[in-house]
């Protein structure tokens, strides 16, 4: 333990640690694990106090089992619930809005989560399969033999279209066209390394909003979303998309979700939903194209109409390349587990990458082995790409369904090869770990028997 009673960590100045995290996060975490073990502290600009990174599943079990907020308690910390570290809100609030589920706390967060959960689970998901498949087929059918491109960009196009048409239910072509133009611009601006430096500098200087320069983009997107909300309220037609279901949802007191809060939820789904799934898809193709044995096994299983290996491929890809590596919390009560004692008020985060690469949990942890997930499941809290507890990713089931459909559609219609030598390096993009060069691929040929096969291997929705 260090002098402040927290797990030890690097003694380098906060600025140096922050720069190392921004530029080489994997190397930083790996070196700290080798030196300090399963729990260590890092200091980041903008967070004020050290952040303790945790990778022991026993400790994560205790962290994720945080008690629900007391009824009526808006501030989760007042009831012993773990809350968000203040530093996290600085970069998210100006874009997501105060009503974003990512930023709400306590009973307010739980109430909103209960309202938003049903559209992303169970039978509701089945209504989205055909539309997602049509979007994927339309994109892949534009690919030509001999063409080379960064697959990450093509996956972004698919997942953005799925959010706009399947989740939002936008049908106005002018609105769709403008959102297709604006959202990638906003994502590029909020994901750049230079923006990270500007945000940290703004925090250091005490500026209220470090993202004013994005205001124009945000305002134009807001106008389009408010127009969609107003139009849908006026029509009052029952539909299966998520926006329609949220418009019809009611709180316990019978009131509806207001326009501003709806906007915040939609922007959160838009920015958090499509980019993370696109990144996960890009990583999956990168891993498959570097591991031809796994690719051939997957193709053979899909030919037989069996999607069990596809599900295993996705699970292994999310293990080896978790898209969101950290999910910070401020402890609302003491945490005692795995021989570790952390007092209430400590900022902590699961180090998902480190948990997923523990050799005691995953033999040969840096190798891509989908077979790990065929006949067994990892121990509790050893596989956490979607987080856990009351803040587990709301759209996890939707994302996995979308990944299954897109991967099967691509592999059934084209044959790909990697267009880059060696392993794609991990780059930090805002809160995600993305492929540094976008995963360059080449279309070797189109498959002659591709039409009609895209739905054949996708099993029942979980």
Predicted region positions:
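Cytochrome P450 heme-thiolate monooxygenase catalytic core
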Residues: 1-6, 72-93, 108-110, 124-279
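Cytochrome P450 fold signature focused on the C-terminal beta-domain
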Residues: 236-240, 297-307, 320-340, 355, ...
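Conserved cytochrome P450 K-helix E-x-x-R motif and the immediately C-terminal K′/meander segment
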Residues: 18-37, 223, 227, 304-338, ...
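Conserved cytochrome P450 K-helix/beta-meander segment immediately N-terminal to the heme-binding cysteine loop
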Residues: 68, 350-376
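N-terminal membrane-proximal hinge/A-helix region immediately C-terminal to the signal-anchor transmembrane segment
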Residues: 1-98, 104, 111, 130-138, ...
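Cytochrome P450 catalytic-core helices
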Residues: 276-301, 397-414
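Cytochrome P450 proximal C-terminal region
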Residues: 6, 33-34, 136, 184-185, ...
């Amino acid at each position: 333990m260090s002098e402040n009673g927290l797990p030890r960590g690097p003694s380098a100045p906060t600025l140096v640690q922050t720069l190392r995290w921004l530029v080489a996060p994997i190397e930083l975490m790996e070196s700290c694990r080798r030196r300090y073990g399963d729990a260590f502290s890092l200091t980041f600009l903008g967070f004020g106090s050290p952040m303790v990174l945790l990778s022991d599943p026993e400790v994560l079990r205790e962290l994720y089992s945080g008690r629900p907020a007391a009824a009526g308690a808006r501030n989760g910390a007042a009831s012993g619930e773990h809350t968000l570290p203040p530093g996290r809100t600085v970069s998210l609030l100006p874009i997501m809005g105060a009503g974003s589920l990512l930023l709400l706390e306590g009973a307010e967060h739980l109430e909103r989560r209960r309202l938003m959960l049903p559209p992303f689970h169970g039978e509701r998901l089945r209504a989205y399969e055909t539309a997602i498949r049509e979007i994927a087929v339309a994109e892949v059918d534009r690919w030509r033999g001999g063409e080379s491109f960064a697959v990450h960009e093509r996956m972004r196009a698919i997942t953005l279209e799925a959010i706009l048409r399947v989740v939002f239910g936008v049908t106005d072509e002018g609105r769709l066209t403008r959102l297709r133009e604006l959202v990638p611009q906003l994502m590029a601006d909020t994901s750049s390394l230079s923006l990270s430096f500007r945000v940290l500098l703004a925090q250091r200087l005490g500026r209220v909003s470090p993202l004013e320069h994005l205001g124009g983009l945000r305002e134009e997107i807001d106008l389009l979303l408010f127009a969609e909300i107003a139009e849908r309220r006026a029509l009052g037609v029952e539909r299966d998309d998520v926006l329609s279901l949220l418009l019809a949802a009611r709180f316990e007191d019978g009131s509806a979700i207001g326009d501003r809060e709806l906007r915040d939820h939609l922007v959160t789904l838009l920015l958090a939903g499509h980019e993370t799934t696109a990144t996960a898809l890009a990583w999956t193709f990168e891993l498959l194209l570097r591991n031809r044995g796994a690719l051939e096994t997957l193709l053979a299983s899909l030919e037989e109409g069996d999607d069990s290996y596809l599900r295993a491929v996705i699970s292994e890809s999310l293990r080896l390349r978790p898209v969101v590596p950290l999910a910070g919390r401020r402890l609302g009560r003491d945490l005692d587990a795995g021989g570790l004692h952390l007092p209430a008020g400590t900022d902590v985060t699961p180090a998902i990458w480190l948990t997923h690469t523990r050799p005691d949990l995953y033999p040969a942890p840096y190798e891509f082995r989908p077979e790990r997930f065929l006949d067994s499941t990892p121990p509790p809290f050893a596989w956490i790409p979607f987080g856990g507890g009351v803040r587990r990713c709301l759209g996890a089931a939707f994302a996995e369904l979308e990944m299954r459909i897109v991967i099967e559609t691509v592999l059934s219609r084209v044959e790909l090869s990697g267009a880059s030598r060696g392993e794609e390096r991990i780059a930090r993009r805002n809160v995600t770990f993305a492929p540094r060069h976008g995963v360059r691929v080449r279309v070797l040929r189109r498959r002659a028997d591709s039409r009609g096969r895209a739905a054949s291997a996708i099993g029942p929705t979980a």
